[in-house]
Amino acid sequence: MDNVKYLSQSVDYLGFLQTKLRDLQGIATLTYELIQNADDVRTEDGKPGATQITFDLCDDALIVENDGVFREADFDRVRRIASGGKREELETTGAFGIGFIAVYQITDAPEIYSSGRHWTIRPDQEENRRVEERSAQLSGTRFRLPWRLRSWKETAVAAGETS
């Protein structure tokens, strides 16, 4: 049995995601954002971390892997959407903290495997239960993006939001 640790993620999550997705549409944007994420990965001492990226289209998900690893700062940025946390890191491509949102075009619950962690992000959950954290051993970083099953409206209704 897995020991699951829940962490909070703050923002009017569904409304913000839906609004920002209007600017992040299309497979080209999604691909760019995932490549940019790999490009932005750094080692703890600031050196470039990812040198390879692969995309694997599976029946149940899109799997994107790179050979870099998430630092604590990278995990924090995923939890604090739109924080602009990369602005001070001149070597990074991203700056505004919204690119990862592009994954919600195709998934309801993105998963991140990196640095001994497996996160599943569930935007339709309460703020303090949106990020499920488990331990996982994997070299590099993997994004598992299970194909979306519901529309945004269905997701908002399931979460108790009607606006």
Question: Can you describe what each PLM-predicted range is?
Answer:
Residues 1-154:
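GHKL (Bergerat-fold) ATPase N-terminal catalytic module, capturing the glycine-rich phosphate-binding loop
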Residues 154-163:
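Well-ordered, non-membrane alpha-helical segments in soluble/globular domains
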